[in-house]
Amino acid sequence: MTKTTTIMALVCILGMASCHAQTHQPAPPTTEGEAATVYMTTDISPEGLVRIYEALGVEAHGRVAVKISTGESENSNHLRPALIKNLVQKVNGTLVECNTAYGGNRGDTKKHRQAIAERGYNDIATVDIMDEEGEIQLPVKDTKHIQYDIVGSHLQNYDFMINLAHFKGHAMGGFGGVLKNQSIGVASTAGKLYIHSGGKTQTRWTIANQDAFLESMAAAAQAVHDYFKQEGKDIIYINVMNNMSVDCDCDGHPAAPRIKDIGILASTDPVALDQACLDLVFNHVSSKGNDAKPLQERINKKHGTHTVEYAEQLGLGTRKYTIVSIDD
């Protein structure tokens, strides 16, 4: 039988213009009719991933993009082909990625394709590097920092996107989930530079004021969401909470995870989904061999929860949610 648990959304202190450590604080309880639904399973397996997709009740259609991170190296904690194969093949999906902005093993298409082959992704599906043949601009609702979102041109080839993210820490954003996966992740190389710089440049690596960077990510995430909410298109969101290092999958030598795996969560609301995952991390009671404190500290140090706060302000979704377990 399906079990439903209503969770209180936890929020970070608002209003900091620079990057200061912030403490996760509780928000008022949700009221009926306001909460988004977030589905959850503790079964981190190919079968569990398919079941969480099916629980959403939104059928992938047309040309389906499955947005993943291919990982900087085999030492990274990216989602492995064996885990995602069944879902990708069930929806006849194409794995999609974009080149990075920091060099490394995925800084250009040739290197990226070699990395994709080495990881084994070619063995389970077609892989499309969306900015291989250029980029396009998507409109943004919020022009406080970025004036548009620069994404791989192949994005326009797809009718449906499954944003399949690995939830973990991040050296710059504090954490990475579905919002990062469709902002930085869907952006072309120039688009990544544009977001990281808070709209200052598309041609060189420039670090923005921390909140400007986080707010730019939220604005870019909304641009992609809105693109797939046009008639005939759609998008859904999945976070896999395993191998949760404090470091992102763009790190070829990440710190070892200190917190044990939690599960897979999914929603049609990206803000609610990332908020639910944050709350699971911050509500976690640490014990020997299962310590959430390093990840909590990384998120707080980078003011990471401001991304979901700002995304909610933009109308991308809500931080209020109900978790529905699909486990028996």
Regions found by a protein language model. Name each.
Residues P29-D328:
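Extended, low-polarity segments enriched in aliphatic/aromatic residues
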Residues M1-P26:
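Bacterial Sec-dependent N-terminal signal peptides
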